């Protein structure tokens, strides 16, 4: 079935599934992790995630080249079944209290999660959400804009070059995520996330310097560093700010929703600027928004507190 309504429906289902995947994996990982092991495991998860994305993209390109685009759908179906089989192997003995970030220092007490409205008083968490929303408002449109510029300059190579950008960036994300697992507990979360955020305005500025095909693809590789760090650090920071509240899952989902809104607005904003002022102005505007994201993150304190297990939301 190839009707617009059917495609829209299936894509909506895919959007729902992808939006809950990362928070669910983070919660399961937390519920299965020993104390102090969450950082390494979440970084490992992200590394495997990016490796899987890269391999899937390569396989999709090869299959599409030899058997046409329809082969990609069979590949995705096979991978989905393999994912289900892997999910069935996840141990069932998940500590549900730990998975939701609920601490109980008194074993005799029955811990209860804090009211959801109390999370709105968690100013660092709100500031983190705003920072992430600005980051994705600036970031989401950059690859589409680069793809459009590549298509204008090299119509015959636009699709292969865009695919190369995506695959190469995914490979860069692997060591970036692994670095989070190694350094997040030593250096703190904020310095690493600042590195990821600071790369974004740099990318926006670098895109304006040249329309050369090799230059655009090379600059896009920087996206792998920022995205690799972001995906691994965000769950750690949310856990830091909500530990003991029992609302880790809700908070991570809320932050994900907020930055998803930023990402959804990004392409429309960039397209409007391109229409009225051109690509250079669009990249500069996105770089400016990325700068605001960096400024907001600078206002956030370091979230990691060694050997601390707060029972109420962190305060500014």
What positions do the PLM features span?
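Hydrophobic core of transmembrane alpha-helices in multi-pass small-molecule transporters
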Residues: 6-20, 215-229
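Cytoplasmic helix-loop-helix junction between adjacent transmembrane helices
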Residues: 10-51
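Helix-to-loop junctions at the C-terminal end of transmembrane segments
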Residues: 64, 176-188, 274
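Short amphipathic helix-loop junctions that connect adjacent transmembrane helices
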Residues: 144-160
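Structural signature of the two symmetry-related core transmembrane helices
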Residues: 191-206
């Amino acid at each position: 079935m190839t009707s617009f309504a059917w495609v829209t429906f299936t894509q909506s289902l895919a959007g729902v599934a992808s939006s809950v995947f990362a928070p669910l994996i983070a919660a399961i990982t937390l519920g299965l992790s020993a104390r102090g092991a969450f950082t390494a495991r979440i970084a490992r998860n992200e590394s495997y995630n990016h490796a899987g994305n890269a391999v899937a993209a390569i396989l999709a390109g090869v299959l599409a080249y030899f058997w046409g685009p329809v082969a990609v759908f069979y590949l995705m179906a096979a991978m989905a079944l393999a994912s289900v089989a892997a999910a069935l192997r996840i141990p069932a003995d998940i500590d549900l209290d730990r998975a939701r970030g609920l601490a109980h220092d008194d074993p005799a007490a029955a811990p209860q999660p804090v009211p959801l409205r109390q999370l709105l008083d968690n100013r660092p968490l709100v500031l983190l959400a705003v920072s992430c929303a600005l980051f994705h408002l600036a970031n989401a449109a950059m690859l589409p804009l680069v793809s459009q510029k590549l298509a204008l300059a090299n119509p015959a190579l636009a699709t292969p070059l865009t695919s190369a950008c995506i695959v190469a960036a995914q490979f860069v994300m692997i060591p970036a995520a692994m670095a989070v697992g190694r350094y997040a507990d030593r250096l703190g979360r904020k310095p690493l996330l600042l590195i990821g955020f600071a790369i974004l305005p740099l990318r926006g500025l670098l895109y304006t310097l040249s329309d050369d095909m090799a230059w655009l693809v090379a600059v896009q590789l920087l996206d792998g560093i920022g995205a690799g760090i972001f995906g691994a650090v965000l769950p750690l920071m949310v856990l830091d700010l909500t530990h003991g509240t029992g609302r880790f899952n809700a908070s991570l989902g809320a932050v994900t929703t907020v930055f998803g809104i930023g990402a959804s607005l990004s392409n429309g904003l960039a397209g409007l600027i391109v229409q009225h002022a051109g690509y250079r102005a669009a990249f500069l505007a996105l770089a400016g928004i990325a700068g605001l994201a960096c400024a907001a993150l600078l206002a956030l304190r370091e979230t990691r507190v060694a050997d601390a297990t707060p029972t109420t939301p962190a305060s500014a």
